[in-house]
From Swiss-Prot:
EC annotation from Swiss-Prot or TrEMBL: 2.7.1.21
Disulfide bond residue pairs: none
Binding site for ATP: G17, A18, H19, G20, L21, G22, K23, T24, R187
Gene that encodes it: TK
Keyword check for Amino-acid biosynthesis: no
Record keywords, A-Z: ATP-binding, DNA synthesis, Early protein, Kinase, Nucleotide-binding, Transferase
Source species taxonomy: Viruses, Duplodnaviria, Heunggongvirae, Peploviricota, Herviviricetes
Record protein name field: Thymidine kinase
Length: 359
């Protein structure tokens, strides 16, 4: 009788950050580092889901909807003598729809993988590392937040998308990749991928979203609570949000010991979440912020400058593994995870990847 497969230690690494940094090449370099007993499985960006699995192309659709929002916003600003406070409702609805399309494959994959995981425990079967090209937080929070700063979606749209973030299984490690702005622009221009958005306002808004995400996770993991100090926060008005998407303004800094004012929550303290000018935040919005806080507090966050070559960046990520959280999976899950990685890579990116040895 065959001996049952032994339990595995599973390390999940989500490479994230603004687009055009080199996350995908770093992920592929990590997959190439797979060795017996220390397998690395790579789950690439789900480009096919966005571009070919539906009648409409999500990248083209969201670019068109964003342009419509920008046109409406500029018209409102001229009429009111200042920045528009809200996005055009119809165009914002389209942006939110396409943003949900971006989130869907990540949410589906996240649910599939999470079902195989358990809290950490003895794992005599060795370690497998799962490397994902982005976490659901990218499509559910960071990119919607950037669009919120640009008034392409409204606060209620952002909370709706953020509420879709799934509960986190044990062992989630988020590696936020960074680059100097000029190098990011150079890499974006060099890859020249159709559908890439490279306007300076959007890029700085996304970069700020990730800096605030790092601060928010650190604040929450240190025991911070958004409800403590919420009432004392200043209102995030249209000018404050516009500054987060203004290349001429200083970018947000990743603070060593962030306070509530250094987090995403501060930018969500806006009057549009208080219907009719009420004095209190509606309970349903507060519950959404509670849920968001719970999801983000579960993430172990690392920051990686990816200026170096992909192999060097991959080595730097592997050097972080001893400090990373892990989950456990039964021995049979190893083969299931390898199959998932092959299927996902083939369907989403047209890549036929082999599973690592030992799984």
């Amino acid at each position: 009788m065959a001996e049952p497969a032994r339990a595995l230690r599973v390390v999940r690494i989500y490479l994230d950050g603004a687009h055009g940094l080199g996350k995908t090449t770093t992920g592929r370099a990590l997959a190439a580092a797979s060795t017996a007993g220390e397998g690395v499985l790579f789950f690439p960006e789900p480009m096919a889901y966005w571009r070919t699995m539906f009648v409409t192309d999500a990248l083209s659709g969201i670019l068109a909807a964003s342009a419509r929002c920008a046109a409406a916003s500029h018209g409102s600003a001229r009429g009111a003598g200042g920045p528009a406070h809200r996005a055009d409702a119809d165009a914002a609805g389209l942006v939110a729809y396409y943003q949900a399309r971006f989130a869907a494959p990540y949410l589906i994959l996240h649910a599939r993988v999470s079902a195989l995981l358990a809290p950490p425990g003895p794992a005599p079967g060795g370690t497998v590392t799962l490397v994902f090209d982005r976490h659901p937080v990218a499509a559910c929070l960071c990119y919607p937040f950037a669009r919120y700063c640009l008034r392409e979606i409204n606060a209620e749209d952002l909370l709706m998308l953020a509420a879709a973030m799934p509960p986190e299984a044990p062992g989630a490690n988020l590696v936020v990749c960074t680059l100097p702005p000029a190098e990011q622009q150079r890499r974006l221009a060099a890859r020249a991928r159709p559908g890439d958005r490279a306007d300076a306002g959007f890029l700085v808004a996304v970069r700020n979203a990730y800096a605030l995400l790092v601060n928010t996770c650190a604040f929450l993991r240190a025991g911070g609570a958004w409800r403590d100090g919420w009432d004392a926060l200043e209102w995030a008005d249209a000018n404050a949000l516009a500054a987060l998407a203004d290349p001429s303004c200083d970018e947000c800094k990743m603070a060593p010991a962030p306070a509530l004012r250094d987090t995403l929550f501060a930018a969500l303290k806006c009057r549009e979440l208080y219907p009719g000018g009420g004095a209190g935040l509606p309970a349903v919005h507060a519950w959404a912020l509670d849920a968001l806080a719970g999801r983000l507090a579960a993430l172990e966050v690392f920051v990686l400058d990816v200026s170096a070559a992909p192999d060097a960046c991959a080595a730097a990520v592997l050097d972080m593994r001893p400090a990373m959280q892990a989950a456990c999976a039964d021995g049979a899950a190893g083969a299931t995870l390898a199959t998932l990685a092959r299927q996902f890579a083939l369907e989403m990116a047209g890549e036929a990847t082999a599973g690592p040895r030992g799984l």
